[in-house]
Regions:
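Charge-dense, low-complexity intrinsically disordered segments
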Residues: 34, 38, 89-92, 96, ...
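Solvent-exposed loop and edge beta-strand segments that line ligand/cofactor-binding
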Residues: 3-17, 80, 84-100, 149-177, ...
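C-terminal non-catalytic interaction modules
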Residues: 270-273, 305-309
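Catalytic cores of carbohydrate-active enzymes
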Residues: 49-68, 103-213, 255, 262-294
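Amphipathic, soluble alpha/beta structural segments
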Residues: 119, 126, 135, 208-240
Length: 309
């Protein structure tokens, strides 16, 4: 057949290629891993070779095996609100979801190379994954059982804020955490971040909590990722729940989904808005329809189907 032509947009952002590998991984669950590897395996492998050699201008692999991104002067994560040209949430250094995605991508690449008989590259990714697994725990896991949101070794900074980005280390197919560690992270997300409309972007117990997305633009910018609830994060939360507890928590996941049902009949009918206030009554805010939110709810509905209750 003809060579596969793929255009990935905005690859200058540090995490875009990691998400591209995740998308390929999800595609394999739909069509079979064999068909996925036949079509996209070489692309996934090439992406990971590019990243693993620190060729990306904004994502570098450090000596400890983790990836590092500079975000002090320019927002580089999905929490990208700015004021006066500077990030409001200056997430920089070792960023927790980047490294959860990185570890998952390394293990998936190892799996792909094993399937196609590329022994040398399989060993390369396997060795990197082993290194990253231990470093992830050393860098992110704190004595309270949750994960630092980011750690910037340059400024000797550990961000103790309880944020939802740690849920990816539980939800993804491959995790550097043990089962007890994953359960502790999940429990903290449940207790401090879960709302009927998604996960809060910041715990009410953390400094700077601002759950109401109201007021003039500058005021809303400061609240955007400081306590507002985001439905798309609930998708990964529910996936994490099913991954940990399987069939026994299907009814719980269904109850979480019910929280979005009424939104289908208000504002823009048949869809879900961008975000919600983090405190009751959880008013809808932002764009009246948000693709990431809709996609994640639909993905969880498909995840539930395989439990056949």
């Amino acid at each position: 057949g003809e060579p596969l032509s793929v255009k990935i947009h905005e690859i200058e952002h540090p995490d875009i290629l990691l998400w591209a590998v995740w998308c390929i991984q999800q595609y394999g669950k739909i069509v079979s891993l064999q068909k996925c590897v036949e079509k996209y395996g070489l692309l996934a492998k090439d992406i990971m070779m590019y990243l693993s050699t620190s060729s990306h201008p904004n994502l570098k692999v450090r000596e400890n095996g983790l990836v590092y991104a500079q975000g002090k002067s320019k927002a580089v994560t999905w929490m990208n609100s700015t004021a006066n040209g500077r990030p409001i949430v200056p997430r920089s250094g070792y960023i927790v979801e980047f490294n959860a995605l990185w570890y998952n991508a390394l293990k998936f690449s190892e799996e792909i190379c094993q399937m196609v008989g590329r022994k040398e590259e399989e060993a390369h990714f396997a060795a990197m994954a082993v290194k990253a697994e231990q470093a992830f725990k050393d860098v992110f896991l704190n004595q309270y059982g949750y994960l630092f949101d980011y750690v910037d070794e340059k400024d000797q900074e550990q961000d103790w804020s309880v944020r939802p980005n740690m849920i990816f280390a539980v939800a993804l197919d491959y995790s550097p955490l043990s089962l007890p560690e994953k359960k502790t992270v999940f429990d903290i997300c449940t207790k401090e971040l879960l709302t009927p409309k998604g996960l809060r972007s910041l715990s009410p117990k953390s400094g700077g909590y601002n759950p109401m997305y109201v007021g003039p633009q500058v005021q809303r910018d400061y609240a955007y990722h400081q306590g507002t609830a985001w439905p798309w994060l609930a998708g990964f939360y529910m996936e994490a729940c099913l991954r940990l507890y399987k069939k026994s928590r299907v009814s719980f996941v269904e109850r979480v989904l019910v929280g979005f049902e009424e939104e289908m009949f208000s504002h823009c009918v048949g869809t879900i808005p961008e975000l919600f206030d983090g405190n009751p009554p959880y008013h809808a805010r932002g764009a009246i329809s948000f693709a990431m939110n809709v996609a994640e709810i639909l993905r969880v509905v498909k995840l539930i189907e395989k439990y056949d209750i």
